[in-house]
Regions:
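N-terminal auxiliary segments of SAM/dcSAM-dependent transferases
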Residues: 1-17
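S-adenosylmethionine/decaboxylated-SAM
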Residues: 19, 23-25, 29-225
Length: 225
């Protein structure tokens, strides 16, 4: 199982860490204070730096067809875009997260071959739009509604669009504030029967107050067996 420690001496890890730290809020290990807008990167520094290193190592220069469920400020999407060769960038979001409009529009503006589908990812109309695109994705991030029922619905519908060699990422697998994700990854029979966890990026260091939301997070990366 790949962990954060596998990358911490890596030059790329330090690069990603520095960029994430500059754009993430203090409660996530970053340097930003709240300014009334949600224009910050909603990622824990060490965890996401290790994730980007893993993805770069896995895909190298290969073209990536990426499906992102939940985008908020779109900064996670931008970090992945800047790190990989994204050929198709499909994003689902209901746009109900407040204060993200300026960051979302600004970040979307420079990404060719991006499709933003607005709506609830669990609704039939949205599912039909994704199906109509006809893509198979070799990278998929499930980071929308974190309630157990919604994570289950997102996974059990969209995993069928994952290619055989594709990677599936879950955010907040170790976050007590949103326990539905942890419950899902430990109990879902389809995930546990058909997928293997390749990477477990959970940060147990003490540089953050463990009562803060972003200090927990946790990122899990899975691949079909």
């Amino acid at each position: 199982m790949i962990e954060i420690k596998n990358y911490q001496e890596n030059e790329r890890f330090q690069h990603h860490f520095n960029v994430i730290r500059a754009n993430a809020p203090v409660s996530y290990g970053g340097l930003k204070l709240y300014n009334g807008k949600r224009d910050y990167l909603i990622q824990s520094t060490n965890q996401f730096a290790a994730t980007l290193c893993y993805l770069e190592e896995y895909f190298k220069d290969k073209g990536v067809q990426y499906l992102e469920i939940g985008t908020a400020s779109n900064l996670t999407n931008s970090m992945i875009w800047n790190s990989l060769n994204i050929e198709e960038n499909i994003i689902l979001d209901n746009l109900e997260c407040p204060g993200t409009a300026e960051s979302l529009v600004g970040n979307l503006s420079f990404k060719q071959n991006t499709v933003l589908i607005v709506g609830d990812s669990t609704q039939d109309t949205i599912k039909e739009k994704v199906q109509a695109l006809g893509y198979k994705y070799n990278l998929m991030l499930i980071d929308g509604n974190h309630d157990y029922e919604y994570v289950t619905k997102d996974f059990e519908y969209y995993y069928r669009f994952l290619s055989n060699d594709g990677l599936l990422i879950f955010h907040d697998i170790d976050n007590d504030a949103v326990p539905g994700v942890r419950k899902f990854i430990t109990t879902n029979p389809i995930l546990n029967t058909n997928f293997t966890q390749c990477a477990n990026f959970i940060d147990n260091s003490n540089y953050l107050n463990k009562n803060t939301f972003g200090s927990q997070c946790g990122i899990g990366i899975y691949k079909r067996k």
